[in-house]
Amino acid sequence: IAEENYSVLKPTAVIFNLGVNDPGNMYDYISYYQEIAESLQKKNCKLFFMSVNPVNSKTIEYLGKNAIRKEVIRKFNSVVGSALGSTFEYIDTYSYLMENGYGTNISGTGVDMPDDDGLHYTTKTYKRIFKYCLDYLILH
């Protein structure tokens, strides 16, 4: 019965986004997304995969932590984006942020903090990512 209630005319956009914590499991993510895609498409969902976004490696390393390299993020985005390409549309926020800049701070809660962890974005950057995705959805 629930299947009958989904709109035939206007699909629901579903955007998947992963963080930078787990690049070693990219093939597990691909399998999982491929596994759930058919079920979501039956519910008239249009599927999108948003890129893993850049980090400020210099800040992370300055804090004495291991930073994921931009090359690893680009490879992850390329492999996952290509594997899902026939079912998911790819929203390349990574390139957008690299071209237009981004800010990081320690918060990640929507309230900016004076400290920076190089990983979480400023409120302004999160809003820019959100707007970029909305603009992408309007065009696609």
Predicted regions and their residues:
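Oxyanion-hole/transition-state-stabilizing segment in secreted/luminal serine hydrolases
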Residues: 1-31, 53-57
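An active-site-proximal structural segment forming one wall of the substrate-binding cleft
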Residues: 5-6, 39, 79-83
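A generic local structural motif
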Residues: 1-3, 34-35, 77-78
